[in-house]
Amino acid sequence: VRQFRTLMKSMSKFPVSFRVGDTAYNGFGRDFTELGRTLENTDTSETTTVRFLYKDSIEIKLICTLYPYHAAYEWTVYFTNIGNENSPAISEINGCNYTLTAANPHLSGILGDGGYDNQANTPYDMNISGMELVINNETGRATYNRFPYFKLKWNGGGAFFAVGWPGQWR
């Protein structure tokens, strides 16, 4: 819950990255005007929607939901061209661009349902100390070679991650 609250306080450091035209962005900094926030509470969740405007032509909607009883949160980013002209290309979208600094990190998961010879659904656990690790599917089928569900554990903690998007992910 504390980490979610910290994320929501500083949009310029929000862990998403993307390009608009030739310009790379990490978070929603000075080129993004915050248009407003809404908060919706239910018995089990708290959803904050933040709307931004980029150069009068692209609206970005960031929907973040906290599930406090499960110590979990999620977010989705939407880009909409609201101008009268074509917008610059939006590319290289990383929906979660996060750097972990932790002692003895291990990544666990299972191989997906294709690709590796006769190894579908095989569990793996690897020490990722000192690695820059990029995992992606290779075809457009979300579960090809690796399932997009991971357990990350380190000395004193851990987390589950899921890439909730069909098709290409990285």
Task: Give the positions of each predicted feature.
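Polysaccharide-binding surfaces and accessory modules of carbohydrate-active proteins
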Residues: V1-Y54, I58-R170
